[in-house]
Amino acid sequence: MIASLHRPTLAKVDLSAISENIEQVVSHIPKQVQTFAVVKANAYGHGAVEVAKHVSKQVDGFCVSNLDEALELRQAGIEQPILILGVVLPDGVPLAIQENISLTVASLEWLALAQKQGLDLIGLTCHIKVDSGMGRIGVRNLKDADNLIAGLKALGADVEGIFTHFATADEADDSKFKRQLSFFTDLVDNLTDRPRLVHASNSATSIWHAATVFNTVRLGVVIYGLNPSGSVLELPYNIQPALSLETALIHVKTLPAGQDVGYGATYTTTAEEVIGTLPIGYADGWTRDLQGFHVIVDGQLCPIVGRVSMDQITVRLPKVYPLGTPVTLMGENGGASITATEVAEKRGTINYEVLCLLSDRVPRSYD
Protein backbone atom coordinates (compact mmCIF):
# COMPACT_ATOMS: atom_id res chain seq x y z
CA MET A 1 0.00 0.00 0.00
CA ILE A 2 1.42 3.36 -1.01
CA ALA A 3 1.79 6.10 1.59
CA SER A 4 -0.65 8.99 1.12
CA LEU A 5 1.86 11.82 1.17
CA HIS A 6 -0.41 14.49 -0.26
CA ARG A 7 -2.93 14.74 2.55
CA PRO A 8 -2.47 16.11 6.07
CA THR A 9 -2.76 12.79 7.92
CA LEU A 10 0.58 11.94 9.51
CA ALA A 11 2.06 9.80 12.29
CA LYS A 12 4.90 11.64 14.01
CA VAL A 13 7.52 9.47 15.72
CA ASP A 14 9.79 10.95 18.39
CA LEU A 15 12.91 8.78 18.17
CA SER A 16 14.52 10.49 21.16
CA ALA A 17 11.57 9.37 23.29
CA ILE A 18 12.29 5.76 22.31
CA SER A 19 15.94 6.17 23.31
CA GLU A 20 14.97 7.71 26.63
CA ASN A 21 12.47 4.94 27.32
CA ILE A 22 15.16 2.31 26.76
CA GLU A 23 17.47 4.13 29.17
CA GLN A 24 14.69 4.37 31.74
CA VAL A 25 13.81 0.68 31.69
CA VAL A 26 17.39 -0.58 31.66
CA SER A 27 18.33 1.71 34.55
CA HIS A 28 15.71 -0.03 36.71
CA ILE A 29 16.89 -3.58 36.00
CA PRO A 30 19.01 -4.57 39.01
CA LYS A 31 21.81 -6.27 37.09
CA GLN A 32 23.74 -6.11 33.84
CA VAL A 33 21.87 -7.72 30.99
CA GLN A 34 21.97 -7.91 27.23
CA THR A 35 19.15 -5.88 25.73
CA PHE A 36 17.25 -6.79 22.58
CA ALA A 37 14.84 -4.22 21.16
CA VAL A 38 11.72 -5.78 19.67
CA VAL A 39 10.98 -4.14 16.32
CA LYS A 40 8.53 -6.66 14.89
CA ALA A 41 5.39 -5.50 13.09
CA ASN A 42 7.23 -2.45 11.76
CA ALA A 43 8.36 -1.59 15.30
CA TYR A 44 4.77 -1.69 16.53
CA GLY A 45 3.82 0.73 13.77
CA HIS A 46 6.69 3.16 14.44
CA GLY A 47 8.98 2.10 11.56
CA ALA A 48 11.38 -0.79 12.08
CA VAL A 49 14.32 0.48 10.05
CA GLU A 50 14.23 4.00 11.45
CA VAL A 51 13.87 2.81 15.04
CA ALA A 52 16.60 0.18 14.70
CA LYS A 53 19.05 2.64 13.21
CA HIS A 54 18.36 5.18 15.92
CA VAL A 55 18.78 2.84 18.91
CA SER A 56 21.49 0.59 17.44
CA LYS A 57 24.16 1.87 19.84
CA GLN A 58 21.89 1.41 22.87
CA VAL A 59 20.99 -2.24 22.44
CA ASP A 60 22.78 -5.52 21.84
CA GLY A 61 20.42 -6.79 19.16
CA PHE A 62 16.92 -6.87 17.75
CA CYS A 63 13.95 -9.22 17.75
CA VAL A 64 11.52 -9.59 14.86
CA SER A 65 8.66 -11.91 14.02
CA ASN A 66 9.67 -13.49 10.72
CA LEU A 67 12.41 -13.83 8.15
CA ASP A 68 11.22 -10.98 5.95
CA GLU A 69 11.30 -8.54 8.86
CA ALA A 70 14.86 -9.64 9.61
CA LEU A 71 15.90 -9.24 5.98
CA GLU A 72 14.46 -5.73 5.92
CA LEU A 73 16.85 -4.76 8.71
CA ARG A 74 19.84 -6.43 7.08
CA GLN A 75 19.09 -4.75 3.75
CA ALA A 76 18.97 -1.41 5.58
CA GLY A 77 22.49 -1.97 6.91
CA ILE A 78 21.69 -3.17 10.44
CA GLU A 79 24.61 -5.42 11.43
CA GLN A 80 23.75 -6.33 15.03
CA PRO A 81 22.31 -9.72 16.01
CA ILE A 82 18.72 -10.29 14.90
CA LEU A 83 16.58 -13.00 16.48
CA ILE A 84 13.40 -14.18 14.78
CA LEU A 85 10.90 -14.96 17.55
CA GLY A 86 8.55 -16.98 15.37
CA VAL A 87 9.24 -20.31 13.71
CA VAL A 88 10.94 -20.30 10.32
CA LEU A 89 10.62 -23.66 8.58
CA PRO A 90 13.92 -25.41 7.74
CA ASP A 91 13.85 -24.32 4.11
CA GLY A 92 14.66 -20.83 5.38
CA VAL A 93 17.89 -21.96 7.04
CA PRO A 94 20.29 -21.25 4.12
CA LEU A 95 19.10 -17.65 3.88
CA ALA A 96 19.30 -17.20 7.65
CA ILE A 97 22.89 -18.46 7.61
CA GLN A 98 23.77 -16.25 4.65
CA GLU A 99 22.40 -13.14 6.38
CA ASN A 100 23.58 -14.05 9.90
CA ILE A 101 20.05 -14.15 11.30
CA SER A 102 19.29 -16.17 14.43
CA LEU A 103 16.35 -18.58 14.32
CA THR A 104 14.01 -19.82 17.02
CA VAL A 105 13.75 -23.60 17.11
CA ALA A 106 10.67 -24.76 18.98
CA SER A 107 10.28 -28.51 18.50
CA LEU A 108 11.95 -31.83 17.83
CA GLU A 109 9.73 -32.06 14.76
CA TRP A 110 11.58 -29.06 13.31
CA LEU A 111 14.88 -30.84 13.89
CA ALA A 112 13.56 -34.03 12.29
CA LEU A 113 12.44 -32.10 9.21
CA ALA A 114 15.85 -30.42 8.93
CA GLN A 115 17.52 -33.82 9.13
CA LYS A 116 15.13 -35.25 6.53
CA GLN A 117 16.01 -32.41 4.18
CA GLY A 118 19.71 -33.09 4.71
CA LEU A 119 20.42 -29.59 5.95
CA ASP A 120 23.85 -28.60 7.16
CA LEU A 121 23.35 -26.23 10.09
CA ILE A 122 26.97 -25.10 10.32
CA GLY A 123 26.86 -21.32 10.61
CA LEU A 124 23.31 -21.22 11.99
CA THR A 125 22.71 -19.46 15.30
CA CYS A 126 19.55 -20.48 17.09
CA HIS A 127 17.59 -20.06 20.31
CA ILE A 128 15.43 -22.78 21.85
CA LYS A 129 11.85 -21.78 22.70
CA VAL A 130 10.31 -23.26 25.84
CA ASP A 131 6.55 -23.36 26.29
CA SER A 132 6.30 -22.70 30.02
CA GLY A 133 2.55 -22.18 29.91
CA MET A 134 1.73 -19.89 27.00
CA GLY A 135 0.47 -22.81 24.92
CA ARG A 136 1.90 -21.64 21.61
CA ILE A 137 5.31 -22.67 20.29
CA GLY A 138 8.07 -24.34 22.28
CA VAL A 139 9.23 -27.55 23.93
CA ARG A 140 7.37 -28.50 27.08
CA ASN A 141 9.85 -30.55 29.11
CA LEU A 142 13.52 -30.90 30.01
CA LYS A 143 14.06 -34.07 27.99
CA ASP A 144 12.89 -32.46 24.76
CA ALA A 145 14.99 -29.36 25.44
CA ASP A 146 18.12 -31.45 26.04
CA ASN A 147 17.50 -33.57 22.95
CA LEU A 148 16.83 -30.53 20.80
CA ILE A 149 20.01 -28.77 21.91
CA ALA A 150 22.09 -31.90 21.36
CA GLY A 151 20.52 -32.60 17.97
CA LEU A 152 21.04 -29.07 16.70
CA LYS A 153 24.66 -29.06 17.80
CA ALA A 154 25.21 -32.41 16.12
CA LEU A 155 24.18 -30.78 12.84
CA GLY A 156 26.60 -27.91 13.41
CA ALA A 157 24.32 -25.21 14.81
CA ASP A 158 25.38 -22.73 17.49
CA VAL A 159 22.65 -22.95 20.14
CA GLU A 160 23.20 -19.49 21.56
CA GLY A 161 20.07 -19.02 23.64
CA ILE A 162 16.99 -20.43 25.32
CA PHE A 163 13.87 -18.46 26.16
CA THR A 164 10.23 -18.44 27.13
CA HIS A 165 7.36 -15.96 27.08
CA PHE A 166 5.01 -15.06 29.93
CA ALA A 167 1.26 -14.96 29.40
CA THR A 168 0.29 -12.76 32.36
CA ALA A 169 3.27 -10.64 33.38
CA ASP A 170 1.11 -7.55 32.80
CA GLU A 171 -1.68 -8.60 35.18
CA ALA A 172 -2.24 -7.90 38.87
CA ASP A 173 -2.64 -11.60 39.66
CA ASP A 174 0.90 -12.97 39.39
CA SER A 175 0.13 -16.61 40.23
CA LYS A 176 0.31 -17.77 36.60
CA PHE A 177 3.49 -15.75 36.10
CA LYS A 178 5.12 -17.40 39.10
CA ARG A 179 4.23 -20.88 37.83
CA GLN A 180 5.73 -20.15 34.43
CA LEU A 181 8.84 -18.62 35.97
CA SER A 182 9.35 -21.63 38.24
CA PHE A 183 8.90 -24.06 35.34
CA PHE A 184 11.38 -22.24 33.13
CA THR A 185 13.93 -21.69 35.89
CA ASP A 186 13.89 -25.37 36.86
CA LEU A 187 14.25 -26.45 33.24
CA VAL A 188 17.18 -24.12 32.57
CA ASP A 189 18.93 -25.06 35.82
CA ASN A 190 18.81 -28.75 34.89
CA LEU A 191 19.90 -28.55 31.25
CA THR A 192 22.77 -30.81 30.29
CA ASP A 193 24.20 -28.09 28.06
CA ARG A 194 22.95 -24.62 28.97
CA PRO A 195 23.06 -21.97 26.20
CA ARG A 196 24.84 -18.68 26.82
CA LEU A 197 21.81 -16.40 26.63
CA VAL A 198 18.75 -17.03 28.79
CA HIS A 199 15.77 -14.72 28.42
CA ALA A 200 12.21 -14.60 29.64
CA SER A 201 11.69 -10.91 30.27
CA ASN A 202 9.38 -9.05 27.94
CA SER A 203 8.36 -5.44 28.58
CA ALA A 204 5.96 -6.29 31.41
CA THR A 205 8.45 -8.55 33.17
CA SER A 206 11.19 -5.96 32.89
CA ILE A 207 8.91 -3.36 34.49
CA TRP A 208 7.05 -5.20 37.24
CA HIS A 209 9.25 -8.27 37.84
CA ALA A 210 12.73 -6.86 37.18
CA ALA A 211 14.31 -8.94 39.93
CA THR A 212 13.43 -12.12 38.02
CA VAL A 213 15.31 -11.36 34.79
CA PHE A 214 17.99 -13.74 33.55
CA ASN A 215 20.92 -12.40 31.51
CA THR A 216 19.01 -11.02 28.53
CA VAL A 217 15.80 -8.98 28.13
CA ARG A 218 13.48 -8.34 25.20
CA LEU A 219 12.05 -4.84 25.32
CA GLY A 220 8.97 -4.33 23.18
CA VAL A 221 6.00 -2.05 23.65
CA VAL A 222 7.51 -0.22 26.63
CA ILE A 223 10.24 1.39 24.52
CA TYR A 224 7.51 3.01 22.44
CA GLY A 225 6.09 4.61 25.58
CA LEU A 226 3.11 2.35 26.16
CA ASN A 227 2.05 0.64 29.37
CA PRO A 228 1.99 -3.11 28.57
CA SER A 229 -0.97 -3.59 30.91
CA GLY A 230 -3.02 -0.79 29.41
CA SER A 231 -4.35 0.79 32.59
CA VAL A 232 -4.43 -2.33 34.78
CA LEU A 233 -1.08 -1.76 36.51
CA GLU A 234 0.52 1.57 37.33
CA LEU A 235 3.93 2.21 35.85
CA PRO A 236 6.65 2.56 38.51
CA TYR A 237 8.40 5.26 36.48
CA ASN A 238 7.64 7.58 33.59
CA ILE A 239 7.90 6.65 29.93
CA GLN A 240 7.03 8.82 26.96
CA PRO A 241 4.67 7.88 24.12
CA ALA A 242 6.74 8.09 20.95
CA LEU A 243 3.97 8.34 18.35
CA SER A 244 1.32 10.96 17.74
CA LEU A 245 -1.32 10.86 15.01
CA GLU A 246 -2.41 14.09 13.39
CA THR A 247 -4.54 15.32 10.53
CA ALA A 248 -6.44 18.48 9.57
CA LEU A 249 -9.92 19.65 8.70
CA ILE A 250 -10.61 19.34 4.98
CA HIS A 251 -14.30 20.31 5.04
CA VAL A 252 -16.51 22.21 7.50
CA LYS A 253 -20.25 22.76 7.22
CA THR A 254 -23.14 23.84 9.41
CA LEU A 255 -26.09 21.46 9.36
CA PRO A 256 -29.59 22.21 10.66
CA ALA A 257 -31.35 19.92 13.12
CA GLY A 258 -32.61 16.62 11.74
CA GLN A 259 -29.81 15.99 9.24
CA ASP A 260 -28.22 12.55 8.96
CA VAL A 261 -24.45 12.07 8.89
CA GLY A 262 -22.54 9.11 7.47
CA TYR A 263 -23.28 5.59 6.24
CA GLY A 264 -26.37 3.99 7.69
CA ALA A 265 -27.63 7.37 8.91
CA THR A 266 -26.57 6.36 12.41
CA TYR A 267 -26.19 9.96 13.58
CA THR A 268 -28.77 12.71 13.25
CA THR A 269 -28.19 16.29 14.33
CA THR A 270 -30.41 17.37 17.21
CA ALA A 271 -29.80 21.09 16.71
CA GLU A 272 -27.78 23.25 14.37
CA GLU A 273 -24.33 21.65 14.43
CA VAL A 274 -20.94 22.31 12.88
CA ILE A 275 -19.62 19.13 11.25
CA GLY A 276 -15.98 18.76 10.21
CA THR A 277 -14.55 16.09 7.92
CA LEU A 278 -11.10 14.54 8.42
CA PRO A 279 -9.10 12.56 5.81
CA ILE A 280 -8.59 9.35 7.78
CA GLY A 281 -10.65 6.17 8.03
CA TYR A 282 -10.61 2.48 8.65
CA ALA A 283 -8.25 1.86 5.70
CA ASP A 284 -5.70 3.84 7.71
CA GLY A 285 -6.30 1.82 10.87
CA TRP A 286 -8.80 4.22 12.45
CA THR A 287 -11.41 1.53 12.81
CA ARG A 288 -15.21 1.66 12.60
CA ASP A 289 -15.70 1.00 16.31
CA LEU A 290 -14.26 4.46 17.05
CA GLN A 291 -17.60 6.07 16.24
CA GLY A 292 -18.51 7.96 19.41
CA PHE A 293 -14.87 8.48 20.42
CA HIS A 294 -13.25 11.90 20.02
CA VAL A 295 -10.41 13.89 18.50
CA ILE A 296 -8.82 17.15 19.64
CA VAL A 297 -9.37 20.42 17.81
CA ASP A 298 -8.01 23.63 19.30
CA GLY A 299 -7.51 21.94 22.67
CA GLN A 300 -11.10 20.69 22.79
CA LEU A 301 -12.39 17.12 22.62
CA CYS A 302 -14.71 16.78 19.64
CA PRO A 303 -16.85 13.64 19.21
CA ILE A 304 -16.70 11.44 16.14
CA VAL A 305 -20.25 11.42 14.78
CA GLY A 306 -21.57 9.08 12.13
CA ARG A 307 -19.81 5.94 11.02
CA VAL A 308 -16.09 5.82 10.35
CA SER A 309 -15.72 5.47 6.58
CA MET A 310 -12.86 3.90 4.66
CA ASP A 311 -11.17 7.25 4.04
CA GLN A 312 -12.99 9.87 6.12
CA ILE A 313 -14.49 10.56 9.52
CA THR A 314 -16.84 13.32 10.63
CA VAL A 315 -16.65 15.17 13.93
CA ARG A 316 -18.87 17.67 15.74
CA LEU A 317 -17.09 20.98 16.22
CA PRO A 318 -17.82 23.67 18.82
CA LYS A 319 -17.64 26.36 16.13
CA VAL A 320 -16.64 26.90 12.53
CA TYR A 321 -12.90 26.45 11.99
CA PRO A 322 -10.95 27.23 8.81
CA LEU A 323 -9.85 24.45 6.49
CA GLY A 324 -6.44 23.12 7.42
CA THR A 325 -6.98 23.50 11.16
CA PRO A 326 -4.80 20.87 12.90
CA VAL A 327 -6.55 17.90 14.49
CA THR A 328 -4.99 15.41 16.90
CA LEU A 329 -6.19 11.81 17.02
CA MET A 330 -3.45 10.60 19.39
CA GLY A 331 -1.12 12.91 21.25
CA GLU A 332 -1.39 16.38 22.76
CA ASN A 333 -3.11 19.48 21.45
CA GLY A 334 -3.76 22.69 23.38
CA GLY A 335 -3.47 21.07 26.79
CA ALA A 336 -5.72 18.12 25.94
CA SER A 337 -4.43 14.64 25.15
CA ILE A 338 -5.52 11.27 23.78
CA THR A 339 -3.44 8.15 24.39
CA ALA A 340 -3.27 4.89 22.48
CA THR A 341 -4.54 3.18 25.63
CA GLU A 342 -7.65 5.38 25.63
CA VAL A 343 -8.26 4.53 21.98
CA ALA A 344 -7.80 0.84 22.81
CA GLU A 345 -10.25 0.98 25.71
CA LYS A 346 -12.88 2.53 23.45
CA ARG A 347 -12.32 -0.31 20.99
CA GLY A 348 -12.20 -3.07 23.62
CA THR A 349 -8.67 -4.04 22.65
CA ILE A 350 -5.05 -3.32 23.63
CA ASN A 351 -2.79 -0.38 22.86
CA TYR A 352 -0.41 -2.65 20.91
CA GLU A 353 -3.12 -3.31 18.33
CA VAL A 354 -4.02 0.35 17.92
CA LEU A 355 -0.51 1.23 16.76
CA CYS A 356 0.14 -1.96 14.80
CA LEU A 357 -3.01 -1.35 12.75
CA LEU A 358 -1.88 2.06 11.51
CA SER A 359 -1.55 1.25 7.85
CA ASP A 360 1.13 2.12 5.34
CA ARG A 361 -1.19 4.78 3.92
CA VAL A 362 -0.28 6.90 6.94
CA PRO A 363 3.19 8.41 6.39
CA ARG A 364 5.60 8.45 9.33
CA SER A 365 7.81 11.43 10.07
CA TYR A 366 10.77 11.28 12.46
CA ASP A 367 12.16 13.77 14.95
Swiss-Prot record:
Record-listed E.C. numbers: 5.1.1.1
GO biological process, one term: D-alanine biosynthetic process
Sites bearing N6-(pyridoxal phosphate)lysine, chain numbering: K40
Cofactor: pyridoxal 5'-phosphate
Residues reported in the UniProt entry to bind substrate: R136, M310
GO molecular function, one term: alanine racemase activity
Entry GO CC: cytosol
Superkingdom of the source species: Bacteria
Sorted UniProt keywords: Isomerase, Pyridoxal phosphate
PROSITE patterns associated with the record: ALANINE_RACEMASE (PS00395)
Chemical reaction(s) catalysed: L-alanine = D-alanine
Keyword Phosphoprotein belongs to the record: no
Pathway, per record: Amino-acid biosynthesis; D-alanine biosynthesis; D-alanine from L-alanine: step 1/1
Family: Belongs to the alanine racemase family.
Function summary: Catalyzes the interconversion of L-alanine and D-alanine. May also act on other amino acids.
UniProt protein name: Alanine racemase
Organism listed in the record: Streptococcus thermophilus (strain ATCC BAA-491 / LMD-9)
